Amino acid sequence: MKILVVFTGGTIGCVRKGEVLSPDNEQKYMLTQMYLDRYGDVDFDTAEPYTVLSENLEGCHMNRLADCLQSYDLNSYDGIVVTHGTDTLQYTSAFLAYIFDGLNVPIVLVSANYPLDDSRSNGFENFVGAIDFIKAGSGNGVFVSYKNADLPV
């Protein structure tokens, strides 16, 4: 299983410094390392076209993301995971769905409600959900993996 992980910023790639969230170069790779430590059954390639909190996202960032993805042979991957902030996740998802319409590889966006080093974070669960979706061959297109809360069954 070969998956391209594209880091773009957002809370999922941040650390808290006092009362402020700041993008962190080490934090984002914590996702892939945590996954490999726990499951170890995926070959990850990584890319990082930019790092920005999603409330600061502009059109040029979306174009840069598309250019980054188009620079890879996407059909050589089983899937693509894009880490992103929650504030503009829906815009980037729609943009990618238009740009990559017809791609035979799933693109799954993931984000987090808190930084990964916060015990309340859903970031790792969202990442695992994305990988599980790709492994299951559940479909092609653009998707979002996001767990809101523990709901009663």
Where in this protein do the model-derived segments appear?
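Active-site histidine-anchored catalytic micro-motif
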Residues: M1-V153
